[in-house]
From Swiss-Prot:
Pfam families: ERG4_ERG24 (PF01222). The keyword Ligase does not apply. It is an enzyme of class 1 (oxidoreductase). The lineage of its organism: Eukaryota, Fungi, Dikarya, Ascomycota, Pezizomycotina. The gene is ERG4. It comes from Gibberella zeae (strain ATCC MYA-4620 / CBS 123657 / FGSC 9075 / NRRL 31084 / PH-1). Residues 98-112 have a biased composition (Gly residues). NADP(+) binds at K477, R481, L516, H528, Y529, D568, C572, R573, R574, K575, Y576, Y583. Residues 1-122 are annotated as: Disordered. The chain crosses the membrane at residues 168-188, 225-245, 269-289, 296-316, 353-373, 381-401, 419-439, 454-474, 535-557. This is Delta(24(24(1)))-sterol reductase. Its main location: endoplasmic reticulum.
């Protein structure tokens, strides 16, 4: 996931990259957690390398020193002068952030991916060209963000805008998406990967009753599966609180007078500790990895019901404690979007942060590993196609984990509330609907979907190439922002790919911020979206074309990413004005250099 925009603010500790401060060397008294200190007071350890601030370059037409604070290339909404906000609002203001782009975890994503993931507004859905024409020459007051003005009550949404069709649309989504997930499971399990349909002479009511009976008998949420699912959630919560990690700070919160919340980031340690525990459970026979695949139906039901239960508790708990934020007054819509902005427990466990990576992407990886274990158990080998998905899902989960500190300044963390949308999507939607490529391979003999070995090798190479593009381009923009802060900390987390840092980059400077016009973003403005599309299509393509369900995620994602690109263009034009037009003139390609 990648962050979207920065807010000017009152002076505070130096940051290594946006929102992050270097942690001190561990003291013998505690080896569990690092703490944040001013940069000048800390030492580096063997896991990080600090690069000096880039040498200042005299202003030139195409290669210029960046401004005091930096906006990422894909920043898509307004910046806010926090000093002015703090003085005018006196700690009682409300603000809107920007959209979530892709980066680590698109989710995912935008991300985060994811993300991951980013949620577009209803007025950003126009075709890209229409958005370009609509936003030409639009000026912007940086002190007004999405209709918010200093002094407004943070518990009330003053924007006058709703997303996803308001109450009707969100009610439909909360009803139909779980039904779709069960429907796809039925097709994958009982209809050989095809769409379930009526038999000759079967009425619609009989067909519906038949499907409901299949869910009841094959996907009943047994108590044992509840125990597995919630044990995993609780153990991951313990890992979040207890394993080593680094501290970072989120974006300043206008309604809190510019307060920056601390976030603890240790998803990287959590991932490898989780994998070690799973290996022990598998080889000891206590919980073989293929159990996740064999019990996919009950697991699906438990995840869906858990999504609703956690959403209900989160919503009414926020109302009871008076923690609601930016409420529209429409209960169904507010339940979907959420009531509380920053729910936390024990002073360290941030629920939005916790659910963003560990639940969706780790579970997706567990299902792929379970499929590999099942094939090895049945056939004595693991097919190349399954290895491809294990590689793909590991790289994605690992990228989300190694770049977790970059998630804390994204749209999901800063702006989205903890409601049904985030809760259900992370607990059930992402891991148990994006996984149908894995489920198809698990349910069929390798001969059914076997690719030519040369084509399969080309798919591995192509995926690794686009992973390099995706990882390096997100690193370029985040490291550029960190270097503008004066210091850059390199965490030696695996894998480290080439071309992650651009020294003395070309930029376009505007009063609203600086636009990076170099590296990958000097070739195409949304090339990281292209990489994400490649990932999604590859997940479907590896299964072939015999079943529609592995293609649910690629089709869904491509529609979503086109919508997001239109929204990004709309907001960047409003934010940067002529500077963004100049960027489009210099970099005319949106997705693929020299093509489109």
């Amino acid at each position: 996931m990648s962050s979207r925009y920065s807010l000017r603010q009152t002076p505070r500790k130096k940051e290594l990259f946006e929102g992050m401060v270097e942690t001190p060397i561990r003291r013998s008294r505690s080896a569990r957690r690092q703490t944040s200190q001013p940069l000048s007071d800390v030492e580096t350890d063997s896991t990080v390398e600090i690069l000096p601030q880039p040498t200042e370059v005299l202003p030139q037409p195409t290669r210029r020193r960046t401004a005091r604070f930096k906006e990422e290339l894909d920043s898509d909404t307004d910046s806010d002068n926090m000093g002015a906000v703090n003085r005018a609002a006196n700690g009682k203001t409300n603000g809107h952030a920007n959209g979530n782009g892709n980066g680590y975890t698109n989710g995912h994503g935008n991300g985060n991916g994811h993300a991951t993931n980013g949620h577009a507004t209803s007025n950003g859905a126009a075709p890209i060209q229409a958005v370009i024409e609509k936003t030409k020459g639009v000026s912007h007051d940086p002190h007004v963000v999405d209709g918010w003005r200093p002094g407004q009550d943070p518990k009330v949404d003053y924007s006058g805008e709703v997303e996803f069709g308001g109450s009707f649309g969100t009610a439909a989504m909360m009803t139909l998406f779980p039904v779709l997930m069960w429907y796809m499971w039925i097709g994958a399990t009982y209809y050989d990967g095809k769409f379930p349909s009526r038999t000759e002479g079967q009425s619609w009511s009989e067909f519906g009753a038949h499907l409901a009976n299949l869910v009841y008998t094959g996907a009943f949420p047994r108590l044992q599966v509840w125990a597995w699912y919630w044990s995993y959630l609780i153990v991951e919560g313990a890992f979040y609180c207890l394993l080593p990690g680094v501290w970072g700070y989120g974006k300043p919160l206008p309604h809190e007078g510019g307060k920056q919340l601390p976030y603890y980031c240790n998803a990287y340690w959590s991932l490898y500790t989780t994998l070690a525990c799973l290996a022990g459970l598998h080889y000891s026979g206590i919980w073989p990895l293929y159990t996740a695949v064999d019990e996919f139906g009950p697991l699906l039901s438990v995840a869906i019901l858990s999504g609703f239960l956690v959403s209900i508790v989160a919503y009414f708990s926020a109302l009871w404690r008076g923690k609601q934020h930016r409420m529209t007054g429409y209960p169904i819509y507010d339940f979907f979007m959420g009531a509380e902005l920053n729910p936390r427990m024990f002073g360290i466990l941030d629920f939005k942060m916790f659910f963003e990576v560990r639940m969706p992407w780790y579970i997706l990886l567990i299902l792929s590993l379970g499929t590999a274990a099942r094939q090895h158990e049945q056939y004595g080998y693991v097919s190349g196609e399954v290895w491809f998905l294990v590689m793909a899902h590991f790289l994605y989960a690992n990228a989300c984990a190694k770049g977790e500190e970059l998630i804390i300044t994204t749209w999901d963390m800063y702006y989205e509330k903890w409601g049904f949308m985030l809760i259900f999507w992370n607990l059930a939607g992402v891991p148990l609907s994006y996984c149908h490529c894995t489920i198809y391979l698990a349910n069929h003999h390798p001969d059914v979907y076997r690719w030519n070995r040369g084509i399969l090798a080309a798919m591995f190479v192509g995926y690794l190439f686009w992973y390099w593009v995706w990882d390096s381009c997100n690193s370029q923009k985040n490291r550029f922002r960190a270097m503008e802060k004066g210091k850059l900390v390199l965490r030696n987390t695996f894998p480290q790919v080439p071309w992650q840092t651009i020294h003395n980059p070309k930029t376009i400077v505007s009063p609203q911020g600086t636009i990076l016009v170099d590296g990958w973003y000097g070739l195409a403005r949304k090339i990281h979206y292209t990489a994400d599309v490649w990932f999604a299509v590859s997940w479907g393509l590896i299964t072939g074309f015999e079943s529609p369900f592995p293609w649910f995620y690629p089709v869904f994602f491509c529609c979503m990413i086109a919508h997001r690109a239109a929204r990004d263009i709309h907001r960047c034009r409003r934010k940067y004005g002529d500077a963004w037009l100049e960027y489009e003139r210099r970099v005319p390609y949106l997705f693929i250099p020299y093509v489109i």
